[in-house]
Amino acid sequence: DFSFCAGIPNENLLKSIPVRDFMLIAANNEDWYPMIEHTFGKKAKKTLRYAIKKEPDIFDKEYLKSIVESLDDDYEIRQFDCEVFELAKKENWSVDLCSQFENYQDYKERALGVAILHKGQLVSGASPYAIYKNGIEIEIDTKPEYRKKGLATVCGAKLILECLANNIYPSWDAHDLRSVHLAEKLGYHLSHSYVTYECEFSK
C-alpha cells in the first residue's frame, strides 16, 4: 500500500505501480511531486506524514508497564490470537490490524499484536502493518465510540513491551499530529515531516 519513489522522476515508473483502492506514494525529492500530480490527477491528495526517530534504547519499560496496568477492569487485554484476528477482519475500523496477512496462521508465524476487548467485543488493537528484519511498523486502531479513553495508549505500550521482549524494534510512522502525540507519550521522538500523496482509486 506504500510506494516510495527515488532517483530521477520517471512517469513510466509511476504508471507501473500496481493500482489498489487506496495507496500512499512518497518520494525522496520534490522533483517527483509535479509528476505524481500529473499522473494521478485529482485522485492524488497531497498530505504530510511524520517520521519518528528510530532509537532502540529510549523506552522506559516500567513507565510502559504502568500504562498497561492502568487499564480499567471493565476491559480485557490479550494477545492477538485466532479469535481476535477473525474479529478484526469483520469491521472496517479494525481490518488494517490484520490486512497484510493471508490468514491467522500466516499472522502467527510472522507477527505479534495485542488487543483490548470489552464484553467480548474488539474495541482497540495494536498490530504490525509491515514487517521487516528484526522490526515492525506499528498500526493502532480503536473503534470510533471507544476513542479518547486511552485504549490506543495502552495497546501501544503493551505492543512495544512485547516487541522489546522478543528483540523486535517497534517502528512508528505517524499519519497525523495526533499520532505524533501518542508516539511521544510512549517515548518516541519526532524526526521530521514529509510529503505523501494519498491516492484513492475506489471512487
Task: Please tell me what each predicted stretch does.
Residues F4-N12, E139-K148:
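A short, internal acetyl-CoA/4′-phosphopantetheine-binding micro-motif in the GNAT/acyltransferase core
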Residues I138, K148-E162, H181, K185:
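Conserved acetyl-CoA-binding loop-helix of GNAT-fold acetyltransferases
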Residues S16-I17, V154-Y169, H189:
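Conserved acyl-CoA
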Residues K53-K54, K185-K203:
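Terminal substrate-recognition subdomain of acyl/acetyltransferases
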Residues P34-G41, H175-S193:
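Conserved active-site alpha-helix within GNAT-family acetyltransferase domains
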Residues N103-K143:
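A conserved beta-strand-loop-helix scaffold within acyl/acetyltransferase catalytic domains
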